[in-house]
Design a protein with these regions (language model features):
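Acidic-enriched and Gly/Ser
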Residues: 1-133, 155-158, 163-178
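Short beta-strand-centered aromatic/proline hotspots
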Residues: 143-151
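Short coil-to-beta-strand transition motifs
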Residues: 128, 137-144
């Protein structure tokens, strides 16, 4: 089913070679809602002096809300700098992958929480979406939903945007988790 061109949805760009700043500036100038957050990090190149540097939380991904037509136009404007994520539709044709509002909201809770121990994955891994689903009911990640998985001998909450990317948290106390039936 092809969606109407004037309907706004969430889409994602894969960003090449650290070209996130000009794309973010474009979105800000055009007033396009987007998610491309940065964190402050101390960077010590030669162990002589450290610099405070802005580092993207998700260096190769920017989420944005716009129409399908505008998303494809932005991709053409930033040729060789970004790639619009695409999936196959019911007619087996590739079209821009629409991301649900709920997935973006939950992913954003975790990605922008500022908690330590977040790991980002450029690829969605369906093997981590088996088992019981949980909701975080307390703490800085309150409202996040995902699967508790074991990675490198640690239990982590795995939150994903299906078919696109994922983030895992550090340790979350069991008292903060509620099983979703």
């Amino acid at each position: 089913m092809i969606q109407p061109d004037n309907e706004e949805s969430w889409y994602a760009f894969k960003i090449f070679f650290g070209k996130g700043k000009p794309i973010k500036a474009y979105f800000v100038a055009k007033g396009i809602e987007h998610i491309y957050d940065v964190k402050q990090e101390y960077w010590d190149k030669n162990k002589k002096k450290s610099l405070l540097k802005e580092v993207p939380i998700m260096p190769s991904l920017i989420l944005f809300r716009t129409t399908r037509t505008e998303a494809e136009e932005i991709e053409r404007n930033f040729l060789n700098k970004v790639m619009l994520y695409r999936g196959k539709n019911s007619e087996n044709l590739k079209e821009p992958s629409k991301i649900s509002e709920r997935e973006v909201k939950i992913f954003n809770i975790v990605a922008t929480s500022g908690v330590e121990g977040l790991d980002f994955y450029d690829e969605y891994n369906p093997k981590f979406t088996k088992g019981d689903k949980f909701r975080v009911i307390e703490g800085p990640l309150k409202g996040a939903e995902g699967y508790v998985v074991r990675i490198k001998k640690d239990h982590k909450l795995y939150v994903s945007i299906k078919g696109l990317c994922a983030v895992t948290t550090g340790y979350i106390p069991k008292a903060y988790l509620q099983k979703i039936e």
